[in-house]
Regions:
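Ser/Thr-centric signal marking residues that sit
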Residues: 8, 118, 141
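Conserved active-site alpha-helix within GNAT-family acetyltransferase domains
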Residues: 118, 144-161
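Conserved GNAT acetyl-CoA-binding A-motif
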Residues: 131-140
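Short hydrophobic alpha-helical segments of the AMP-binding
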Residues: 128, 141, 152
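GNAT-family acyltransferases
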Residues: 1-102, 107-110, 123-131, 144, ...
Length: 197
């Protein structure tokens, strides 16, 4: 999947490149220049540790997953002091189903509970479903992560219950699914649009 720039009401979703991920792994000044945004000292979010970033870099540069795409979320709110990196989100292939894509996201603690994740996921969904072979988007989250559950519910995902060991998903998580047909029937008003390159 080729990520394209996405603009929502308050966010620029910047597609990652090998260069961006390389900078994130060791040179936040360069990352700041590449994103044209401040990179907070607390970056990256806890879920995006060095191991995860290294795997993203490998998938991006080696093109091992045809459904891998990732965006860095830059807050670019009119009237704000400047652009700030606040989170990220991306997609990857489901192990057992070529028509399902997995979605994940994370936001820095200082920027949580402001609606950024909901806004970004709403912006990502039309881009994901623009790939006609994708019929389902799946996400997982832990039951105690209430804010993450709210993001999924607000963006139209339905809870499918606890995930099972052996499905390639983390045991103890809840599964959520957004079917293309349900999304097309109830298109969310995200205000997002792919940006011309």
């Amino acid at each position: 999947m080729t990520a394209q720039p996405i603009r929502t009401r308050r966010l620029d979703l910047v597609p990652v490149t090998g260069e961006i991920l390389s900078a994130d792994l060791g040179d936040h000044k360069r990352l700041s220049r590449l994103l044209e945004a401040e990179v907070p000292a607390a970056w990256p979010p806890a879920e995006m540790n060095h191991e995860v970033l290294s795997e993203f870099y490998r998938m991006e540069t080696e093109k091992t997953d045809p459904l891998f795409a990732c965006w860095y979320w830059v807050l670019d709110e009119p009237g704000a002091a400047g652009r700030v990196l606040v989170g990220s989100g991306g997609t990857g292939s489901a192990i057992s189903d070529q028509k399902t894509v997995l979605i994940g996201y994370s936001v820095l603690d200082a920027f949580q509970n402001r609606g950024y994740a909901t806004e970004a996921v709403q912006g990502m969904i039309p881009v994901i479903f623009s790939h006609t072979r994708i019929s389902r988007i799946m996400a997982t989250t832990f039951p105690e992560l209430k804010a993450s559950i709210r993001v999924l519910e607000k963006t139209g995902f339905a809870c499918t219950g606890p995930t099972l060991a052996g499905d390639g998903l983390e045991e103890g998580t809840l599964g959520f699914v957004l079917e293309r047909g349900a999304w097309e029937t109830h298109l969310p008003a995200s205000g997002s649009r792919p940006r011309d390159s």
